[in-house]
């Protein structure tokens, strides 16, 4: 159970609770055991109003407490504790961590294979059938769940969570407070090949990938995402970067601090992406280009050259009836001949 007092403390790591001085001792001691939407929440749950579209549900909510802006706080029921904040959605994000289920397993599982030269910090959890290579360093309070592989000479920071089936290649550096979800591949071989005179006969000459992957602090990487090691220089993921599931980051890519990347995006080699960029789902970005800070790319955008001015960019056409699309496609081909 989480008290209102604990919620306030958590919220105020990001923003103030504007009416906390008005809450009495009984309200501050109120205990909650979960989070629900305005319509379904019960007296032991917290809810929030982040979108005015749901304002009609506020007056009838049975939530024990609600996160709300000053503009709407008078519309909450009298028996519901209103916590007034500038951003209810951010407050919800902050307190959600208090209600998350914590893993019950700790310590090192007897089936884990750990090299004698590995340096394991304090309060580290290593799950079943993990393999930890030579000269690996794992920071305090980090948790590796089952079947994680960490190759030689890799360093993992403090307070990291690494989910099952993650593979981290040799010589990589993972920062502090990093979350790698199931099936992530860090530091696999980049897609580097030189063509021979006739690849159909003599094939392609493999280029050894000699760089590393460097991941900053407070990074989250979703399931089945692949981040390849650099060919010569390193592949670099900055601080506070969040990457969704099924994203491909090729060798020598650099991603700036605070950038968010949605699922199915592919970033080709040696491209540099700035800080605070927002990249929608299924975006394709060609190699050897630069994207400046504060760029937003809407879903399925295809980027073929550098972007030097901050702003929002899109490409492609939205869904329409097939007959209309065929007419539009004809006109598009005609424009190309003009």
Curated annotation (Swiss-Prot):
This is UDP-3-O-acylglucosamine N-acyltransferase. GO terms for cellular component: membrane. It comes from the Bacteria. Catalyzes the N-acylation of UDP-3-O-acylglucosamine using 3-hydroxyacyl-ACP as the acyl donor. Is involved in the biosynthesis of lipid A, a phosphorylated glycolipid that anchors the lipopolysaccharide to the outer membrane of the cell. It comes from Psychrobacter arcticus (strain DSM 17307 / VKM B-2377 / 273-4). It catalyses: a UDP-3-O-[(3R)-3-hydroxyacyl]-alpha-D-glucosamine + a (3R)-hydroxyacyl-[ACP] = a UDP-2-N,3-O-bis[(3R)-3-hydroxyacyl]-alpha-D-glucosamine + holo-[ACP] + H(+). The active site is at residue 251. GO terms for biological process: lipid A biosynthetic process. Homotrimer. It is an enzyme of class 2 (transferase). Keywords: Acyltransferase, Lipid A biosynthesis, Lipid biosynthesis, Lipid metabolism, Repeat, Transferase. Its EC number is 2.3.1.191. Pathway: Bacterial outer membrane biogenesis; LPS lipid A biosynthesis. Belongs to the transferase hexapeptide repeat family. LpxD subfamily. InterPro entries: Hexapep (IPR001451), Hexapep_transf_CS (IPR018357), LpxD (IPR007691), Trimer_LpxA-like_sf (IPR011004), UDP_GlcNAc_AcTrfase_non-rep (IPR020573). The gene is lpxD.
């Amino acid at each position: 159970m989480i008290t209102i007092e604990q919620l306030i403390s958590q919220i105020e790591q990001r923003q103030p609770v504007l009416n906390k001085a008005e809450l009495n001792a009984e309200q501050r001691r109120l205990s909650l055991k979960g989070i629900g939407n305005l319509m379904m929440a019960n007296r032991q749950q917290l809810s929030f109003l982040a979108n005015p579209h749901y304002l009609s549900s506020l007056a009838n909510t049975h939530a024990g407490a609600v996160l709300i802006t000053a503009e709407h706080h008078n519309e909450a029921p009298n028996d519901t504790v209103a916590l007034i904040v500038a951003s209810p959605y951010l407050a919800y994000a902050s307190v959600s961590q208090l209600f998350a289920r914590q893993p019950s397993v700790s310590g090192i599982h007897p089936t884990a294979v750990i090299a004698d030269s590995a340096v394991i910090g304090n309060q580290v959890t290593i799950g079943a059938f993990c393999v930890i290579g030579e000269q690996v360093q794992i920071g305090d309070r980090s948790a590796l769940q089952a079947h994680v592989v960490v190759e030689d000479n890799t360093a993992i920071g403090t307070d990291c969570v690494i989910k099952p089936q993650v593979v981290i290649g040799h010589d990589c550096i993972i920062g502090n407070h990093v979350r790698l979800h199931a099936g992530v591949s860090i530091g696999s071989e980049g897609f580097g090949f030189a063509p021979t005179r006739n690849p159909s006969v003599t094939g392609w000459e493999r280029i050894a990938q000699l760089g590393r992957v460097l991941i900053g602090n407070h990074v989250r990487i979703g399931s089945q995402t692949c981040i390849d090691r650099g060919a010569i220089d390193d592949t670099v993921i900055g601080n506070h970067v969040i990457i969704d599931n099924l994203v491909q980051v090729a060798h020598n890519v650099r991603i700036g601090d605070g950038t968010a990347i949605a699922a199915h995006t592919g970033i080709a080699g040696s491209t540099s992406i700035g800080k605070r960029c927002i990249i929608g789902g299924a975006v394709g970005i060609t190699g050897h280009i630069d994207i400046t800070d504060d760029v937003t790319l809407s879903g399925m955008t295809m980027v073929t050259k550098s972007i030097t001015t901050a702003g929002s960019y899109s490409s492609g056409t939205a869904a329409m009836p097939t007959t209309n699309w065929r007419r539009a496609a004809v006109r598009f081909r005609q424009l190309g001949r003009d």
